[in-house]
Amino acid sequence: PHRELQALYTMMRVFMAILCSLLAVCSVSARDSRQKGTDGQAAIYRLPPFERAVRCTKYFEGWHSEKHHPYVGWGHQVQPGERYSARTMTKRQADALLRKDLRKFCAMFQQFGKDSLLLATLAYNVGPYRLLGSGKIPKSTLIRKLEAGDRNIYREYIAFCNYKGKRHAMLLKRRKAEFALLYVP
């Protein structure tokens, strides 16, 4: 019985040594991956602002397939006369289309200077007329504030987070990410 007990203690020591080694390796690995995550987050800020807008839009829009008609690629809304198909669109074509749309919206909001890219990114998601107004839709508080020269627009910007009349958590997260990435103080 004494030898069996000694063997059991030895096995437990070996097991504990292996377990401690495994925990040490896991904690070092987790620390390294967290640091890489931080570097990855910092890396996006090293990109030019337009590239940040493209990456952010792709991340939140996701890929649109045939079931998302009339949206294709990274969220482009097919306009009358356009002949895009979600079935045949490549990632490269969708990327080019996203960039073309963002440039078009930047031009639409160029009078707002350094806020034009932020507004273009918002317009890509909600439509330019939700911001600028037209017919039955009044001009947004965000645009009225910018026209008055007030650039303290965080609250007005993140207010664009409703879907079917209700606040949507993912849209709020998207607005906060866009603002953090694209707002120029």
Identify the function of each model-found stretch.
Residues 10, 27-28:
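Intrinsic disorder/low-complexity segments in short proteins, especially the signal peptide
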Residues 69-72, 76:
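Early exported N-terminus immediately downstream of N-terminal targeting peptides
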Residues 110-115:
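Structural motif
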Residues 1-11:
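Short, Lys/Arg-enriched N-terminal segments with co-localized hydrophobic residues
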Residues 17-24:
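Bacterial N-terminal signal peptides
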Residues 19, 29-64, 76-100, 105-108, ...:
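Long, amphipathic alpha-helical surface segments
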Residues 116-130:
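Short N-proximal segments of mature Sec-exported proteins
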